[in-house]
Amino acid sequence: MEGKWLLCLLLVLGTAAIQAHDGHDDDMIDIEDDLDDVIEEVEDSKSKSDTSTPPSPKVTYKAPVPTGEVYFADSFDRGSLSGWILSKAKKDDTDDEIAKYDGKWEVDEMKETKLPGDKGLVLMSRAKHHAISAKLNKPFLFDTKPLIVQYEVNFQNGIECGGAYVKLLSKTSELNLDQFHDKTPYTIMFGPDKCGEDYKLHFIFRHKNPKTGVYEEKHAKRPDADLKTYFTDKKTHLYTLILNPDNSFEILVDQSVVNSGNLLNDMTPPVNPSREIEDPEDRKPEDWDERPKIADPDAVKPDDWDEDAPSKIPDEEATKPEGWLDDEPEYIPDPDAEKPEDWDEDMDGEWEAPQIANPKCESAPGCGVWQRPMIDNPNYKGKWKPPMIDNPNYQGIWKPRKIPNPDFFEDLEPFRMTPFSAIGLELWSMTSDIFFDNFIISGDRRVVDDWANDGWGLKKAADGAAEPGVVGQMLEAAEERPWLWVVYILTVALPVFLVILFCCSGKKQSNAMEYKKTDAPQPDVKDEEGKEEEKNKGDEEEEEEKLEEKQKSDAEEDGGTGSQDEEDSKPKAEEDEILNRSPRNRKPRRE
């Protein structure tokens, strides 16, 4: 009960606040102005206090250095594009206006860097083709060492449609980096790519058919992990590809595995073709019967089957309702309508008033010619069809026969791919300021991990040092998603309200405790409490009258000792009265 009163009180206070707001708009404006002044003062004092407060410890940047043998490594901290070659090629089958690879590249720090001095390769322009590449220290040969490719990407402005993948360019005599374009042969393509709501993390390798010498792209299965955050959180992420001589592979993001598999089993299309194929010359015989069911040829239509019977018939038991207005139309011309002044009968034809519902039909069951309602025809059977039976001549679904695949081959070591001698980025992007950093290619996992700790690890530590607290993160999230304010308010206000409700609502004493304290009469049955009270009241009055008469007679007999007896009789009378009220001494109910 007290909880209900508290809820009512809150509703009343809320209503009063709304009414006060409606009646004192001018006062609220003044209050808002005062609050603005206070906020400005707080911000000024905060800025002053910030200047006096010592800054939080910062992570000092130091360029990573390879700790072992690498085929390629670049942290861009020298501040230039030296070692990288911009493409001068044009794309085939593309308009001249966009065929050129004229997208801009620069070496610069991130726009909101937490590590001063840390620079990277930045794709600067949007809606342009970009191509840049660099030679390896020496070509990578797929022999007994694993291949590990790793680099960092930060979508500083998010990403609408575009990629941030790398290509490992195949070692060929025709390789010319200043003519690097989309058709330049590559061995592996690896990295993130996104367009619309399709988030990808590519791993593609080009496999050479040992029989024909033709290369075919093999795509790894899609990762099971949700990749969206890596494209939208505007943080630097570390992408790693590991290929092992046993044909296994792993794809990691921020040093956590998001995809893994085997080159023989988890690529599409498969590396090795099937041993048998369907004979392209085989043809289905003309008498081949693929029908599992056929109409029973021995079935006969029953004599009483009427195919012409309609599905609906008029209800012969229906009668026209009383008051039906047969002579009144359901719609009539609007008597209040007037022909527009600009109506030209030569151009617009003869003017007719718009139709409105007949007002006479509103009080009647209906207007116009009455027709019997339609009901389902109990004799309707429809078109007769013979029942279906199993086809005794069913031969199954025809398939062409299998023959040995003339193009079959079996490559059990797809890891031994075409050697590559350069790394390149050939990208189209609708978003600018894509930041690349800390490329490394090696055959030693330890060297790559050390490089990651000295490069990406510092970025992660710097981001953690500058990361706002839990409250700050909640406020930032609410700024991006305003509906979170409702969640925060409910999360905070509801527990507070429950605590107040618990503290303010005292434990109510039970009725049994109350009766025990006062020795008041307690009804045996609550539903008959009213009747019992009326009956007990009459019995009490009768007992009191008898008690008074007895006291008077005792007083007359005792004379001088009457006063003392009266004093003794008072507590006794009160005790008798209490006993009479007790449910144990209550008289039986009168029927």
From Swiss-Prot:
<dbReference type="GO" id="GO:0006457">
    <property type="term" value="P:protein folding"/>
</dbReference>
<dbReference type="GO" id="GO:0044322">
    <property type="term" value="C:endoplasmic reticulum quality control compartment"/>
</dbReference>
<feature type="region of interest" description="Interaction with PPIB">
    <location>
        <begin position="327"/>
        <end position="360"/>
    </location>
</feature>
<dbReference type="GO" id="GO:0098978">
    <property type="term" value="C:glutamatergic synapse"/>
</dbReference>
<feature type="region of interest" description="Disordered">
    <location>
        <begin position="514"/>
        <end position="591"/>
    </location>
</feature>
<feature type="topological domain" description="Lumenal">
    <location>
        <begin position="21"/>
        <end position="482"/>
    </location>
</feature>
<dbReference type="GO" id="GO:0032839">
    <property type="term" value="C:dendrite cytoplasm"/>
</dbReference>
<keyword id="KW-0256">Endoplasmic reticulum</keyword>
<dbReference type="GO" id="GO:0044233">
    <property type="term" value="C:mitochondria-associated endoplasmic reticulum membrane contact site"/>
</dbReference>
<feature type="modified residue" description="Phosphoserine">
    <location>
        <position position="582"/>
    </location>
</feature>
<keyword id="KW-0007">Acetylation</keyword>
<protein>
    <recommendedName>
        <fullName>Calnexin</fullName>
    </recommendedName>
</protein>
<comment type="similarity">
    <text>Belongs to the calreticulin family.</text>
</comment>
<dbReference type="GO" id="GO:0035255">
    <property type="term" value="F:ionotropic glutamate receptor binding"/>
</dbReference>
<feature type="signal peptide">
    <location>
        <begin position="1"/>
        <end position="20"/>
    </location>
</feature>
<feature type="disulfide bond">
    <location>
        <begin position="361"/>
        <end position="367"/>
    </location>
</feature>
<keyword id="KW-0106">Calcium</keyword>
<dbReference type="GO" id="GO:0048488">
    <property type="term" value="P:synaptic vesicle endocytosis"/>
</dbReference>
<feature type="modified residue" description="Phosphothreonine">
    <location>
        <position position="561"/>
    </location>
</feature>
<dbReference type="GO" id="GO:0033162">
    <property type="term" value="C:melanosome membrane"/>
</dbReference>
<feature type="repeat" description="2-2">
    <location>
        <begin position="368"/>
        <end position="378"/>
    </location>
</feature>
<feature type="topological domain" description="Cytoplasmic">
    <location>
        <begin position="504"/>
        <end position="591"/>
    </location>
</feature>
<feature type="repeat" description="1-1">
    <location>
        <begin position="279"/>
        <end position="291"/>
    </location>
</feature>
<feature type="transmembrane region" description="Helical">
    <location>
        <begin position="483"/>
        <end position="503"/>
    </location>
</feature>
<keyword id="KW-0430">Lectin</keyword>
<dbReference type="GO" id="GO:0048787">
    <property type="term" value="C:presynaptic active zone membrane"/>
</dbReference>
<keyword id="KW-0472">Membrane</keyword>
<feature type="repeat" description="2-4">
    <location>
        <begin position="396"/>
        <end position="406"/>
    </location>
</feature>
<feature type="compositionally biased region" description="Basic and acidic residues">
    <location>
        <begin position="514"/>
        <end position="538"/>
    </location>
</feature>
<dbReference type="GO" id="GO:0051082">
    <property type="term" value="F:unfolded protein binding"/>
</dbReference>
<keyword id="KW-0597">Phosphoprotein</keyword>
<feature type="binding site">
    <location>
        <position position="426"/>
    </location>
    <ligand>
        <name>an alpha-D-glucoside</name>
    </ligand>
</feature>
<feature type="region of interest" description="Disordered">
    <location>
        <begin position="261"/>
        <end position="347"/>
    </location>
</feature>
<feature type="repeat" description="1-4">
    <location>
        <begin position="334"/>
        <end position="346"/>
    </location>
</feature>
<dbReference type="GO" id="GO:0005840">
    <property type="term" value="C:ribosome"/>
</dbReference>
<feature type="modified residue" description="Phosphoserine; by MAPK3">
    <location>
        <position position="563"/>
    </location>
</feature>
<keyword id="KW-0732">Signal</keyword>
<feature type="region of interest" description="4 X approximate repeats">
    <location>
        <begin position="349"/>
        <end position="406"/>
    </location>
</feature>
<feature type="binding site">
    <location>
        <position position="75"/>
    </location>
    <ligand>
        <name>Ca(2+)</name>
    </ligand>
</feature>
<keyword id="KW-0143">Chaperone</keyword>
<feature type="binding site">
    <location>
        <position position="193"/>
    </location>
    <ligand>
        <name>an alpha-D-glucoside</name>
    </ligand>
</feature>
<dbReference type="GO" id="GO:0036503">
    <property type="term" value="P:ERAD pathway"/>
</dbReference>
